[in-house]
A protein has these predicted regions:
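Charged structural interfaces that engage phosphate-rich ligands
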Residues: 1-211
Length: 211
């Protein structure tokens, strides 16, 4: 585990299991969305049929067993909790009980821009997922607590949060085409002087590219 091929291998394995499960089931889910080994499923055939489907799912492979949560009003999938109440649907940020929120420590030797971008990017994530002002404020408060516990100072946190607050949530929910990156990466072994070396090399490369 931990190698680059692990997610792809797991996805192929679960894709085969998923296909065998759905093709052999007498009753089909209304919808089925899977990300590697996490599944969001909508069921409309009754409780007895659901129990039979789940029992069948756990019989497909001898060592792969599905744990499940069943609810008519609230369900969590990946990092999102969706709640339906009085005909309205809201979304909230979901964190697993095992999540320790171990954000990159400011005491590490990573470039400074990495630490500045984390409060901003995580605040954007909160703003995108949380559909109400109340839950957004609550999750940003949680995020501030986790970041301070990891050693982030108030100035860096507030700067990232302020920058995120200026972005309209509607724009965050729009699909954006991914740009093709044609840059050739320069991969170097880490060295404490890399930042200084970058400051020297970057202007030289910039001049060469303009010619």
């Amino acid at each position: 585990m931990g190698t680059k091929m692990t997610p792809s291998y797991a996805n192929i394995f679960m894709g085969d299991l998923e296909e065998r499960l759905l093709l052999s089931s007498l009753k089909q889910p209304l919808s089925w969305f899977r990300f590697i080994d996490d599944v969001d499923m909508k069921w409309t055939h009754g409780d007895k049929e659901l129990d039979e489907f789940l029992e069948h799912a756990n019989s497909i492979h001898p060592s792969i067993k599905f744990t499940h949560e069943v609810s008519k009003t609230k369900i969590s999938f990946l990092d999102t909790t969706t709640t339906v109440k009085e005909g309205n649907m809201t979304t909230d940020l979901y964190s697993k009980p095992t999540d320790k929120h171990q954000y990159l420590s400011p005491s590490s030797c990573h470039p400074k821009h990495c630490f500045k971008s984390i409060p901003f990017s995580q605040a954007i994530r909160v703003k995108r997922i949380c559909s109400t002002v109340e839950t957004t404020k609550q999750r940003l408060g949680d995020l501030r607590h986790h970041l301070k516990r990891r050693g982030y100072n108030d100035k860096v946190i507030e700067s990232g949060f302020s920058k995120a607050s200026e972005i309209n949530r509607k724009n965050l929910l729009e699909y954006k085409e991914k740009k093709i990156n044609k840059r050739i990466p320069l991969v170097l072994t880490f060295h404490p002087f890399l930042e200084k070396i970058s400051g020297i090399v970057r202007p030289i490369i910039g001049k060469k590219l303009k010619k």
